Design a protein with these regions (language model features):
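Soluble non-transmembrane domains of integral membrane proteins
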Residues: 1-264
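Helix-loop-helix
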Residues: 16, 114-117, 143-149, 199, ...
Length: 548
């Protein structure tokens, strides 16, 4: 009769079925799904299972007398079973040969050691099969509150013999044929994964990896995974393959310590700079405060302050530049009134001359913004991927890894969703306030008005985009805005004396003016543009005279 046999240690609990001899359940101990996390009855809090309803299989295919044999249909008997060791065998009809799966689990480890052996099958398996196909299949259950985001971050990762780690498309139906030999292949979910690793070699090429939504899939299912692999077979009396099967959370330090590149599955940003910021600044700082036992809301606040302190010299320069432009506003308004709309180039030259006389670099305020952008975008990757925030509450947010809903709507608003995230509202409100403070110092004119409109539209766009994102991310953006507003007010009213700054600008006007290389290039570009406009308008004027 079919039976299940289990192995477990302090971290994982694994179940195997005698039919097929492969794993059918993999539980991460101490972790729960979003549904079980908040159950009042602790006895009902089942550990999180990476496999949906015994849906996993590890199927070997080979031929005997030109008939295909699939190991998933064979019944394996238990040859040895302890709390951390299991040996399963499927015998031939005469019991002279067998396929053997040997599993062993060390204490306090996420790794299952796997040995696949073919014993006495050299006359059973038809000649011509130097490799035995191994089809690894699994359906992953839903684990998180936001199913669409969970599916969008679920995929198959793999490491090739060249050492590069790649993935197929994320979410839904994706397929890829990998033309290199593969060292490991991993079925990744949003915060957890299980990875099959070939020890002392690689799975031979080609390897096919695919994900899809089962036709019957409902809200309890994430994705179905399939990997078409092969293992070597030498037609000897005893042929074996050693593998390792890891079932673990996507925790950066834990995976990095394994030295196999498994941490590359964690999305820290596609652009190298974003990934570097997360690897060498954000994660070390985050882990340092985590080891002190601080709450994650406080850790995010401290992380925000540290980043703001690092950027404070640039921010100070930006605010000084903004203050200078604000003091020049009356003169800039005069120039706007002086020149007609068709004299844009002349007006621009006059503005540049005014800036040069006052010692103002109009691009000085842009550099700090450009420097801050990589940090903002790095956080966009870090917070939704940080398993430390999973099911960790703060204030009204029950789980900082997903959205914080203060109101569930009975309908869905296009581009917004069917819930209201308070942290997203706070982020949007403070972004608009900070935008207002900055835009009040901008120049006037048609182009500036269009830019101001865009600056106010962007927070509204983010309101829709980020409403279903991590509460931790929106909380960080909210704190970043609040700190920026406080820094702005402090610098403007406490650290910058506008009267002294005005006197300094007047003194600069009295000095002989030497054009900087940048200003000279800008004026040269303006003159070239003016000449191009004249050349383009000249033929039109001649045509007009001919008609007259």
């Amino acid at each position: 009769n079919p039976e299940k046999v289990s192995l477990s240690n302090e971290k994982i609990s694994l179940s195997f079925h005698s039919k097929g001899g492969s794993l059918v359940s993999a539980k991460i101990l101490g972790e729960q799904t979003y549904q079980n996390r908040f159950l009042e009855d602790s006895s009902q809090k089942a550990d999180l299972d990476l496999v949906y309803s015994d849906s996993a299989s590890m199927n070997l295919e080979f031929y005997h007398n030109n008939q295909r044999i699939e190991s998933k249909n064979l019944y394996f008997s238990v040859a040895k079973a302890t709390s951390q060791t299991l040996v399963l065998r499927a015998y031939t009809n005469d019991s002279a040969g067998y396929i053997q799966w040997s599993y062993s689990l060390d204490a306090n480890s996420y790794a299952l050691k796997v040995d696949l052996s073919f014993v006495g099958l050299e006359t059973v398996i038809d000649r011509g099969q130097s490799d035995i196909p191994l089809i690894w299949s699994q359906i992953a259950p839903r684990q998180e509150l936001n199913l669409s985001n969970e599916r969008a971050t679920s995929t198959i990762y793999y490491k090739t013999e060249s050492g590069s780690v790649s993935r197929i498309g994320r979410g839904g139906e994706n397929s890829e044929e990998i033309e290199e030999a593969v060292e490991w292949i991993s079925f990744k979910q949003q915060f957890f994964f299980n990875s099959l690793i070939f020890k002392n070699g690689q799975f031979k090429r080609p390897v096919q990896a695919q994900t899809q939504l089962p036709g019957w899939a409902d809200s309890s299912v994430n994705l179905a995974y399939n990997a078409f692999l092969s293992v070597p077979y030498g037609y000897s009396s005893a042929s074996s393959v050693s593998m390792e099967w890891i079932f673990a959370p996507l925790h950066f330090q834990t995976l990095a310590s394994m030295n196999m590149g498994l941490e590359e599955q964690i999305d820290l940003g596609y652009i190298g700079l974003f990934s570097l910021i997360n690897r060498y600044l954000v994660i070390p700082v985050f882990n340092f405060f985590d080891q002190l036992g601080l709450g994650y809301g406080i850790i995010i606040l401290l992380l925000t302050l540290i980043i703001k302190v690092l950027l404070s010299p640039l921010n100070f320069k930006m605010f000084v530049s903004s203050a200078k432009i604000r003091l020049l506003k009356p003169e800039l308004d005069e120039l706007n009134a002086k020149f007609k709309p068709d004299e844009a180039l002349k007006k621009q030259q006059a503005v540049m001359q005014l800036y040069r006389q006052a010692g103002v670099n109009p691009l000085a305020g842009c550099l700090p913004m450009l420097v801050q952008m990589p940090f903002l975008l790095a956080m966009f990757s870090f917070f939704p991927s940080a398993i430390e925030l999973r099911q960790q509450g703060f204030l009204w947010a029950e789980d900082l890894s997903t959205y914080d809903s203060i109101l569930n709507l009975p309908f869905e608003i296009p581009f917004y969703g069917s819930h209201v995230s308070l942290f997203t509202l706070l982020m949007t409100a403070t972004t608009i306030l900070y935008t207002h403070l900055n835009s009040s110092q901008m120049q006037t004119g048609a182009n500036m008005q269009q830019m101001k409109i865009m600056m106010y539209i962007m927070p509204i766009v983010f309101l829709g985009v980020l409403n279903s994102y991590s509460a931790g991310l929106n909380y960080y953006y909210f704190l970043s805005n609040v700190v920026s507003i406080l820094i702005y007010l402090a610098i403007r009213y406490l650290f910058i004396d506008e009267n002294k700054l005005r006197l300094k600008m007047e003194a600069h006007k009295a000095k002989p003016q030497k054009k900087s290389k940048w200003m000279q290039r800008l004026e040269d570009a303006q003159r070239m543009r003016e000449q191009q406009v004249k050349q383009q308008s000249a033929p039109k004027n001649r045509q007009g005279r001919r008609k007259n």
